[in-house]
Amino acid sequence: MRILGIDPGLRVTGFGVIDVSGHRLAYVASGVIKTPTADLPTRLGTIYDGVSTLIREHTPDQAAIEKVFVNVNPQSTLLLGQARGAAICGLVSGGLPVAEYTALQLKQAVVGYGRATKEQMQEMVARLLSLSGLPGTDAADALGMAICHAHGGNTLNTLGGIAPALAKKGLRVRRGRLVG
């Protein structure tokens, strides 16, 4: 099964594509969709078009996207919600079922600690997918979203979560830190 993860943002939207087979996670692609400095409709159109292109290029079976959190600044929350909406429209237009997860669910599923830092997310994603370097923060969150969906969507053993994949690599999580 191929999963497309999306980390929505008005300036930068992260994406990550993984293949899941049993307990095995395999990296396919990741990166960002950058919007131009332009009016809001143009930026939202760029996100929609970018997501649509990703679906055509990578042919995912399912998608996962981060739920909007309420920011201190209501204007920022509204803009993020619009960017997320543009991404969801692209996913649905591409015929994908879309799952939504909170940042807490994402961090808990990937790192094993709901208050994990960006750096901890990057490190764990790189280890779980056997990457040679750390992905950028937006791409790491998007890859993490795909991993979270693989876990929550019963593609990985939900009783063991990501523990079997970590154990095979000689790793475990202790106090939010990856140890080996």
Curated annotation (Swiss-Prot):
Residues that coordinate or bind Mg(2+) 1: 7, 138
Keyword Chloroplast applies: no
InterPro entries to which the protein is assigned, alphabetical: RNaseH-like_sf (IPR012337), RNaseH_sf (IPR036397), X-over_junc_endoDNase_Mg_BS (IPR020563), X-over_junc_endoDNase_RuvC (IPR002176)
Cofactors (names): Mg(2+)
Cofactor binding annotation: Binds 2 Mg(2+) ion per subunit.
Residues binding Mg(2+) 2, per UniProt: 66
GO cellular component term, pick one: Holliday junction resolvase complex
Top-level taxon of the source organism: Bacteria
Keywords: Cytoplasm, DNA damage, DNA recombination, DNA repair, DNA-binding, Endonuclease, Hydrolase, Magnesium, Metal-binding, Nuclease
EC number: 3.1.21.10
Entry's Gene Ontology BP terms: DNA recombination; DNA repair
Catalytic activity: Endonucleolytic cleavage at a junction such as a reciprocal single-stranded crossover between two homologous DNA duplexes (Holliday junction)
Biological function: The RuvA-RuvB-RuvC complex processes Holliday junction (HJ) DNA during genetic recombination and DNA repair. Endonuclease that resolves HJ intermediates. Cleaves cruciform DNA by making single-stranded nicks across the HJ at symmetrical positions within the homologous arms, yielding a 5'-phosphate and a 3'-hydroxyl group; requires a central core of homology in the junction. The consensus cleavage sequence is 5'-(A/T)TT(C/G)-3'. Cleavage occurs on the 3'-side of the TT dinucleotide at the point of strand exchange.
Family classification: Belongs to the RuvC family.
Protein name: Crossover junction endodeoxyribonuclease RuvC
Record gene name: ruvC
